[in-house]
Each structure stands twice: as C-alpha cells, then as structure tokens.
Amino acid sequence: MSDSKMDKLARMAPLPRTPLLTIWLAINMALIAQETGHKRIHTVQAATGGGSMLGDVNISAILDSFSVSYDKRVRPNYGGPPVEVGVTMYVLSISSLSEVKMDFTLDFYFRQFWTDPRLAYRKRPGVETLSVGSEFIKNIWVPDTFFVNEKQSYFHIATTSNEFIRVHHSGSITRSIRLTITASCPMNLQYFPMDRQLCHIEIESFGYTMRDIRYKWNEGPNSVGVSSEVSLPQFKVLGHRQRAMEISLTTGNYSRLACEIQFVRSMGYYLIQIYIPSGLIVVISWVSFWLNRNATPARVALGVTTVLTMTTLMSSTNAALPKISYVKSIDVYLGTCFVMVFASLLEYATVGYMAKRIQMRKQRFMAIQKIAEQKKQQLDGANQQQANPNPNANVGGPGGVGVGPGGPGGPGGGVNVGVGMGMGPEHGHGHGHHAHSHGHPHAPKQTVSNRPIGFSNIQQNVGTRGCSIVGPLFQEVRFKVHDPKAHSKGGTLENTVNGGRGGPQSHGPGPGQGGGPPGGGGGGGGGGGPPEGGGDPEAAVPAHLLHPGKVKKDINKLLGITPSDIDKYSRIVFPVCFVCFNLMYWIIYLHVSDVVADDLVLLGEE
C-alpha cells in the first residue's frame, strides 16, 4: 500500500468512536510503514549492486576465522623446523654520533617477514593480501626481536601508531615499524680527528634459540638501505655492510644479524679551531728570536703567553673528549706545538744565562788586566833600578832595591826590593839597614845583574843568593774566583797575576837552582843559565792578560758561541723542525687512517 492510499484511507475513515478501533488503526499504520522501509532498502541495494556489503562480510569472516583454534603463545611449526625471519632496514636519518658517550642515534624503518601457516586463507579476486591495523598484532604470534646494543629506543605514535601488518593468502606476514634507537658504538680514537668509526646495530631473538628462530637478511646484499639525505655536522656516511652470525651464550646458540655503518670524520672544524691556531701560536713564539736579547720584558711576556695559550687550547680540546689512556693523533700535534713553544722560552733563558756569564767574565778580565798593568809598572820600575846599580848594593827609597852583604848561608842576608806603591822612604831604607846590621862580616859583596828582573828571577834568587824580597811586591792580590784560562792548568787568579807556576812565597831553590859561585851574576841559577820564566818583564804575566785585544773574541764567547749566535741559529732551526714535523705528521696519519672496511657498500653505489 502506497503513501497516497494511506492518506486517502485516513481521510475516509470516520473518527474513532471506541478505543478498540483506535488500536486497530495504529497497528495497520505500523505495518504499512515497515513495508515501505523494506522497499527503500531493496531499492538502495539494487542501485549499488550489493557487492561492498558482501566483501565486508567476507573480510571480517576471514579475520575472525584466524582466532578460531589459534594460540598466539606458540610459534609456527612448533616442534618442526625453525621459523625463518627475514629482516630489512631503511635508515631515514642519523641524528648524532657522540665520542663522549660512545653511541649514535638513528631513525629507520624496521621490517620483518615470516610465514605462519595458521594464517593462510583462500585466495579471492582482489583479496590476495590483507592490510590490517596495528591492533591485529595483539592477536597473532610475532618474533621476540630486540636490539642487542640498544641504549634507548623510541616508538613513534603520532598521529597514530607507526606500524602496519600485511597478511598474504599463503600465510606470510609482513610487519613494518618505525623506530628511533640510540645504540652503543665503541670507538677507537687513536687517529682522532682523522679517524673512521664503524658503528653497528645487532638484531637477535630474546628468548628463542636457533632451534626455533633463524634470522636472515631478506633481500640479500640489498637488505639495508641508507637515505642519500643523511648528514651529520662532523661525519660523513661512507657506506654500510651487513652480516649474519651465530652467538653462543650460556642459554644456547642464537641467530644474530648486524648492520654496520662506517663514518668518516670531517676535518674542517678541527683545522679551523685547533690545528691552525696552534700552528700560529708556535709561529708567534718565534718572534722573540728577532727581538733584542736585552728586551727581557718583551721576550719573557711573549714566551709565557704562548705557553699558557697552548696549555689552554690543549685543555679545552681534551675536555670535549672521553678520558682515554692512549695517545691520540691530535695529542701528538698539540704536544709537539707545546714543546716548540716551551723550547723558545728556554732558548731565551739560555741566551740570558750566557750573556750574564760572558758579562761576568768580562768584568773579571778587566779586573785582572788592571792588576796586570799595575804589576807591569812595578816590574818596569824595578828594571829601571837594575839599570842603575848602587855600588853599595843598597838601594833605598821608594822603589829601590837593597842587596845585603849576607851570603847564601847568612841568617839575614838578602836582597831588599822596594817597588814604589805609595810607600814611604822609611820602608826601603829601614829594610836595607836591617840587612846590613845582620849580614855576615866576611861575606862577599853582592852585585845586582843588569838583566831585567821579573817575578821568576826574583823567586829563583831567593835562597840561591841568600836574598829576601820585601816591599810592595809581596802585597798579594788574592781572588777566590778561578780564571777560566788558568783553571785548566790548576791555577787561580792569584797565580795568574803573580806569574803562573811560581808564587811570591816560593823561596826555596828548585832543581838545578843550587847556590852559584860567589861573585856570580845576580840572576844566575845552577850553571849560570837563565832562570825559568825568562828575564822578560812580560813573562811574569800571561800574554792574554797583558794583551787583552788578542783574546777579545774569545771573551765574548761561551763554549765557542755567543748569545747572538743562538738567536741566529734558532731563527732557522725552529721553523725547519716545525715544517718537517708537519710534513711527517700529515703524511703518516692521513695514510694510516685511510682504512675502508671490507665488503663495504658505499653510499653512492646502492
């Protein structure tokens, strides 16, 4: 009955007079409405063909049939051959690689493939593979895969869980999930910062041994992929490789897969921040070689500043690295730079020390020269007195020479020599008179030789002729500091000034210096020959003291070099050594660090 007929019936029917009639009309109208609704439903189904509803019902039935007699606690083929789980990975990004923490973080797609015969279904047209949501994973068995060297992992859930399941009609399962994992990466920093690191991710079953699960790379050598957009601030991805291995533990043997990624460090940062500044600091330390050695504040300040700067640079570099016990390549470079800078500071210390020693030697030689000149003047005065001998053999007065009558054995005989050094006449006359009063009455008369008298002459005559020397010649000048040239001969400054071998107090006769015959020459020794040391006035004083101009060059040198020579040599030696070190350093370390892992799939060759 149509709607128009119902409207006509309602208009034609009189108003109900009893409740029974009202109920009857309500029932009829309800039946008419139900019939009309069924007609509308059949009309919609006829328009759409009715296939989608049938498909929905079939897929739901397939999914519902999986739960019938399915136990997700039991692996497929339990008691039979192990389940083969294929694995593929595709690295989306690598966010960090830390030397301090020894780990790296990467974001990747992780896919697993296995077969579960219990999930097989009859193939229908258009229904070869079922793509279902992540909730379905709770209803089936999945491998208990974990990452062996994982430190921290993150599962992405925005906007929904980043995971899907695909069930093939043959029972093969594909599970894909997106993960971000921080995994440990032990590093060898021996060649840092020219090192290459090989980091890996290890995949293994947590509970199933090889009798239950075996892992394999599902697509062979192409099972691991790395996006070409992967980049890091300090590293470049050189390539990757994959391995399959068996691990023996106390609980059994386990199948394990390893994906290894090799990184090569970029040198730009370390060249700009460490290598170039440290090299320039070494070059700056060489500036002190061109400064005047008397500019102590400038050279010391420059040396100390460069040393402290290198120390700060080394400390800041090692602060950003782990506390390792072996030597890194950057430690070799920085250590050498520090030694070069420190050596330049020690070079100035050496120059200053040598200059001080040479200055002290000059002052000492000037004092010796002054004393030698005074001695020479004394000898010249004595020789002049010898040129005009006194018949009485007694020369008094300042600078006079008195010869007493005493013989060689006389107790008081001798020659009184008074060389004027500001002494009064009473000294010369007094000593001469003393010699006469104590001389032997029958001693032969002594004469003084016309030959010039030196220190050696006087010393040899002492005791030979029974002479004694008094006066200013015995006013000795003694120094505790050893003269370098006399030191090698065992002499002191005192010996140098007083004639070398013999001192003024060597009164006893030596070998061959026996008493001469009476009346002999005043300077004669045994046999009347010339005494040791000669009669030259300059023989009493070494030539290098009487003629300082001849040894001026030696005075300005210490160990054969001068302080200026050290600066000149340093200007050449230091740069040459540093350049040679740099050549050897870069050639050796760049060669030994250029190591590529075997069977590595380079990033551009995928």
From Swiss-Prot:
Major localisation: membrane
Membrane topology of the entry: Multi-pass membrane protein
Single Gene Ontology MF annotation: GABA-A receptor activity
The protein's role, per its UniProt record: GABA, an inhibitory neurotransmitter, mediates neuronal inhibition by binding to the GABA receptor and opening an integral chloride channel.
Stretches of the chain found on the membrane's Extracellular side: 45-268
Segments crossing the lipid bilayer: 269-291, 297-316, 333-356, 569-590
Annotated S-S bridges: C185-C199
Signal peptide: 1-44
Classification via Gene3D superfamilies: Neurotransmitter-gated ion-channel ligand-binding domain, Neurotransmitter-gated ion-channel transmembrane domain
Alphabetized UniProt keyword annotations: Cell membrane, Chloride, Chloride channel, Disulfide bond, Glycoprotein, Ion channel, Ion transport, Ligand-gated ion channel, Membrane, Postsynaptic cell membrane, Receptor, Signal, Synapse, Transmembrane, Transmembrane helix, Transport
Compositionally skewed regions (Low complexity) per UniProt: 381-395
Bias type Basic residues, positions: 430-443
Biological source species: Drosophila simulans (Fruit fly)
NCBIfam families registered for this protein in UniProt: LIC
Organism domain of life: Eukaryota
Residues carrying a glycan: N58, N253
Family the UniProt entry places it in: Belongs to the ligand-gated ion channel (TC 1.A.9) family. Gamma-aminobutyric acid receptor (TC 1.A.9.5) subfamily.
Name of the protein in question: Gamma-aminobutyric acid receptor subunit beta
InterPro entries cross-referenced by the UniProt entry: GABAA/Glycine_rcpt (IPR006028), GABAAb_rcpt (IPR002289), Neur_chan_lig-bd (IPR006202), Neur_chan_lig-bd_sf (IPR036734), Neur_channel (IPR006201), Neuro-gated_channel_TM_sf (IPR036719), Neuro_actylchol_rec (IPR038050), Neurotrans-gated_channel_TM (IPR006029)
Comp. bias regions, Gly residues: 396-425, 499-536
Pfam family, one: Neur_chan_memb
Spans annotated as Disordered: 376-451, 482-542
